[in-house]
Amino acid sequence: MRIVPPSVFVCVLFVAGTAAADVLQVFSERQGMSGQFIQHIVTPEGELLETSEGQFSLLRPHFVRWQIESPDQQLLIVNENTLTQIDWDLEVVSTRAMTPENRSALDWLMAPARELEQTFDISSSSRQATLIPREQISAFERLEIEFEATSLRWELSLTDSAGQILTVTLTEDPDVMPTRSDFDPPPTDFE
């Protein structure tokens, strides 16, 4: 299994809404969401490296829960400025600060419109947005977001500097709105 930095998982998570407005505008108005995800990591040549799936929850301003259920069991939680990663298969818990230096695509998407416009070349419509950094940033070289309103499904495609592509399908459950307590790391029998 290829290990992908937790910041990559975190960086593609917090996007949802309705197709009535510009995708990034919809994003900026969104307070939270929960649902299921399927994630694929693909080489620049198109070879599938890994597929995983699980549950996610997102809550503004800085809360993310990314629970990988298959093929391994991992939990990534961003609670304000702290990232906690729990790997039940390896029985490991790690914690690190989320700082401006390791700013993820998620942080960029949550930025004010003026900051996005200064940092990225953006093309956007009611269904799709593409963000390309004007200068090198660590998280990605290209982020594409597409929304399927009828199925409440979001397709995210993040291309890194090596040309590797992380695609994530988020299927929103409109009946489940996360609460602040969903982002407290659970206790474990290991540290």
Regions found by a protein language model. Give the residues of each.
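One face of beta-strands
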Residues: 33-39, 52-56, 64-66, 156
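Gly/Pro-enriched, hydrophobic low-complexity segments
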Residues: 94, 117-118, 123-191
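Short, well-ordered turn and helix-capping elements at secondary-structure junctions
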Residues: 39-43, 60-62, 70-72, 133-135, ...
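An acidic-aromatic
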Residues: 55-105, 166-167
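Extracytoplasmic
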Residues: 30-32, 51-53, 61, 71, ...
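Bacterial N-terminal signal peptides that target proteins for export
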Residues: 1-9
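Flexible, processing/modification-adjacent segments and terminal tails
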Residues: 22-43, 47-49, 86-141
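N-terminal signal peptide c-region/cleavage motif recognized by signal peptidases
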Residues: 15-18
